[in-house]
């Protein structure tokens, strides 16, 4: 079930019910867990931001810092360390979930967090790690 606080009004068959709208999600886990969704740069709504001087980094600098499995793992680990510190969540359980191409990153991210950020995870979930099509 979806983890958010609200869900669409749907029939048992999955069709919208009139009047259209949302209802409380009885399966939401937000009363017992924090969920943070992280997208690597240029996926979802994640984008490269201008430098402190207001200029966009060069394409070469962007490739070096963001585009590639190893680059993604490095900056995501640094971001997670910063987020965990700022939100005072070091004592909270931490799980990573990666789907499709994200499984490669999550696998490496778990190791990077442990080796370079001193962050030990409670678990890792890999969804559809390969395409057998």
Language-model region placement:
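N-terminal cap/lid subdomain of alpha/beta-hydrolase-fold enzymes
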Residues: 1-62
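Alpha/beta-hydrolase active-site loop
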Residues: 21, 28-33, 40, 64-86
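Beta-sheet entry/capping signal
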Residues: 33-36, 92-96, 120-125
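Active-site nucleophile loop of the alpha/beta-hydrolase fold
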Residues: 40, 122-133
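Substrate-gating cap/lid region and adjacent catalytic-acid/histidine neighborhood
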Residues: 60-78, 112, 117-118, 129-133
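Secondary-structure transition/capping motifs at alpha-helix termini
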Residues: 86-91, 113-122
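Alpha/beta-hydrolase fold nucleophile elbow
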Residues: 87-101
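Short glycine-enriched nucleophile-adjacent loop
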Residues: 103-115, 124
């Amino acid at each position: 079930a979806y983890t958010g606080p609200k869900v669409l009004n749907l029939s048992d068959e999955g069709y919208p019910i009139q009047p259209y709208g949302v209802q409380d999600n009885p399966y939401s886990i937000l009363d017992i867990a924090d969920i943070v969704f992280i997208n690597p740069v240029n996926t979802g709504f994640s984008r490269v931001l201008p430098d402190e001087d207001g200029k966009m980094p060069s394409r070469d600098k962007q490739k070096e810092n963001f585009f590639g499995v190893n680059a993604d793992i490095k900056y995501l680990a640094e971001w997670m360390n910063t987020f965990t510190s700022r939100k005072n969540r070091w004592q909270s359980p931490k799980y990573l979930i990666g789907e499709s191409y994200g499984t490669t990153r999550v696998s490496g991210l778990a190791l990077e967090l442990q080796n370079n950020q001193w962050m030990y995870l409670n678990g890792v979930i890999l969804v559809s790690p390969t395409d057998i099509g």
